[in-house]
Amino acid sequence: MKHLTKIAFLALLLASTSCASRKKTVAPVQPQPFEWLTANMDIQAEGNGMNFDDLSGQLRMRKDSLVWLSVTATLGVEVLRAKVSTDSVWIVNRIEKTYLAEPMKNISETLGIPLSLALLQTLLLDNNEGLPPVENQTVQLKSFVWGNLSAKIKYHNIKLDEKTAFPLKITDKMERYHLKKKGY
């Protein structure tokens, strides 16, 4: 009798769980509000005949105000540092030992694309709504092809902060570097 009770219990348990079909409801993903965003990234990029497979980076962003990016290669060697504000772009290329400090308008005209801080933040945050049309443009989750530039970005250690700002010491160094090179 003991075995019959156990078998009946197991059969009842199996019958109650095996035939149930459940539809999982997935809520639509909404953009998270933030004031500051900090993220580490693994980057694969190619464009203009160059291919970079093993890059990592650190992204710091203030909504509608600033994008700061530091890209490092293997062994932690910094390859590129960039700061993009609403009206200017500063880029230090450590490999070629060059830098760029230009108004956003000049870079937009040179590239022939409507470049802006809002567009850059849209691409980095994987929010493809409102992107201006460009030939061969595709934007997908954590990767994009825009014109002749393509990149795959894998974010990890993302931190959204609504109040606290990150220290701008590294960006200040970049500006001091720019002023030193200009001879000011």
For each feature predicted by the language model, list its residue ranges.
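Short beta-strand segments that buttress and anchor functional surface loops
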Residues: M41-A45, L69-T72, L141-W146
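An acidic-aromatic
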Residues: V67-L117
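Bacterial signal peptide processing site
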Residues: A20-K23
